Amino acid sequence: MLLTIDVGNTNLTLGLYNGDQLGRHWRLATDHARMPDEYGLQFLGLLQNAGKTITDLTGIVLASVVPNLTGRVIHACQEYLKQEPLVVDTGVKTGIRIRYEDPRQVGADRVADAVAVLRLYGGPACVIDFGTATTFNAITKAGDYLGGAITAGVNLAAEALYTHAAKLPRMDLQRPPSVIGRNTVHAMQSGLLFGYVSMVEGMVARFRSELGSDMKVIATGGLAEVVAKETDVIDIISPWLTLDGLRIIWELNQ
């Protein structure tokens, strides 16, 4: 089995693949203070939870956008899972052409998303990944990754409001009863959710004007389903898109 690991700023996502089929998968909170031994023991526990041992693993592929954790996770894989992980970085075969001015600046998760979309859905496409940051990524029919746009994720925006506006409370992101909020919490929920949806709709329209009217829109990440319920511009929700991309990258490098 192949273990895929996506290390993000907020979540650490793992999945076990048997061929192209995703089996057990986990989304954990990223802990920036955790040491390599702690990660290693946690990974062993997850394998045990899935009824597997390290002898069942045929490989590990890793994407990380958290530099200070990358080495710790690699060490955990080496010492506890007895595997040298394939790390998505420059020099790794991806099957796409990255047209960024400096390809080294493209996050490994964005690369994995693009690889998965091109293989599973084809281009032209706009991939929206709702994470700590929300990214919009443009992929052509020919397999070129053109770049995209990066903005603060909705939870990050909510935290900024709470932190920097003294009278605004911390609240859960839920759909308010109406766009016009009748109290502070509903007003914040309206601004964050509906304002965010409007931003997504506007960005999709702008991407479509450059990629063409046949552009597909694929959404992934923790808030993809929440946003998709409020708009019709999202064609496909693919919750584990990044892990699918990591699996494909692994296959391309064997």
What are these regions (language model features)?
Residues 50-105, 142-148, 153-154, 182-193, ...:
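Short beta-strand-loop/turn "lid" adjacent to the catalytic site in phosphate-handling enzymes
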Residues 38-50, 199, 203-204:
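Short, well-ordered amphipathic alpha-helical segments that serve as non-catalytic structural scaffolds
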Residues 2-45, 143-170, 174-175:
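Short glycine-rich, Thr/Ser-proximal phosphate-binding strand/loop in the N-terminal lobe
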Residues 50-55, 120-122, 210-213:
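Glycine-rich phosphate-binding loop signature in dinucleotide/nucleotide-binding domains
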